[in-house]
Every structure is written in C-alpha cells, then in structure tokens.
Design a protein with these regions (language model features):
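Extracellular glycan-modifying ectodomains
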Residues: 1-195
C-alpha cells in the first residue's frame, strides 16, 4: 500500500462517483482529508462550475429526498448525494468545511496536487478538460497540479487527447466502474513521483 507520507503530491478526488474516493482514501491511503467530491456523484461540468463560482449551487435548492434503488438521494443541478442526508444540518456543515478545506488547499503554494476523476460511459466528459485546466490556472495561478482523468466512455467518435504534459487521459476498455482498475491506474501515475 502506498501512503501519502511517501508521496509529494496531495491526491484529491474530483468525482464523478464514490469509487474514486474509496480507492484513494481506503484502498491506497493516499488522502487523509475529506473533500467535497468524495462519495457523491458529480458532473465534470459541475466541478468546473463550482470551481469558477465558489461552489455556488453545490447543494440542491430544496433538499427533498428521493427514494430510489435502495438509496435516499438528493439531486442537485450537478450533483447527486447518495450517502448523505442533506436534511441534517451537521451534514451540510461538514460539506461546507470540506469546501473550505478544498479551496484553501488549492490557494496554497506548498504542495502540488494530483486531481483524480473517473467519468461515465455515456458521453465524453474529457472534452471539458481544457476548461477545467483554464479555471484552475485562472483561480489558483500558483498551484502546481496534474489531472488524471479516467473515462469509461465507449463511443465511436474521436477520443480527447491532451497536449498538456500535466494532464493524463486514460480511456478504460469497459463501461464497468471497477475500483481495481483505478487502483492500478493511480498507482502507475504516482509511481514515478515519490518524494
């Protein structure tokens, strides 16, 4: 198991689903702090919106639960909360702390950050990567960062390819969300960057 103590980057999940945080936090012990995109569903467009607008509209306007597939879900414009009861004030406060921690980490200049995202099979969110990079550079100009973007997209159209050396885009050969695949991919990306 790799540990954050032996690695020079802060590793941070930016969604799109719970498995990314589960791999980084539980299976690899790479992230000891909770951040806002851990254990929620989020669109990449939403991540970009939240970064650009200080997390405006992160929570559903009216936190009314929907009971579906054995889960109590809260639907926002760019988010779905499956594991958190947003009707509980302490849960909302915990997310607000995560947001402050996340923004504070991005504003510091000390540690580089590796953002990790997994994207679903139905459309190619990777085409939004240039906008994400632009927003990060605009809002946090001193931040040194990389992005590992793992996509389950299986469409026939041309796949996104980045020319930015700090952006790693990997199209996975399956629609299945498999944590073991993430474990391997994250391990490969950080393997050569130990402190």
């Amino acid at each position: 198991m790799m540990n954050i103590e032996t690695h020079n980057e802060k590793i941070v999940s930016i969604g799109g689903w719970c498995g990314v945080a589960a791999v980084l936090r539980k299976k690899m012990a790479l992230c000891q702090e909770a951040f806002p995109f851990d254990y929620i569903l989020s669109s990449f467009e939403g991540v970009i919106h939240f970064l650009r607008n200080d997390f405006d509209a992160f929570f559903p306007e009216k936190p009314v639960p929907c009971f579906e597939d054995g889960f109590t879900k809260f639907f926002g414009r760019h988010t779905i909360f499956l594991h958190h009861d947003l009707q509980e004030p302490e849960v909302v406060e915990a997310f607000k702390r995560r947001i402050r921690r996340f923004l504070s980490m991005l504003a510091q200049e000390k540690s580089p950050v590796l953002f990790v995202r997994a994207s679903g099979p139905y459309f190619d969110e990777a085409h939004n990567i240039p906008e994400f990079v632009s927003v990060i550079r605009e809002r946090f100009p001193a931040l040194k960062f990389r992005l590992l973007f793992m996509s389950h997209y299986q469409g026939e159209d041309e796949k996104f390819q980045s020319t930015d050396e700090n952006v790693i885009v990997q199209y996975l050969g399956t629609e299945e969300f498999r944590e073991d695949e993430y474990l391997t991919r994250v391990g490969e990306v950080i393997g050569g960057n130990r402190g």
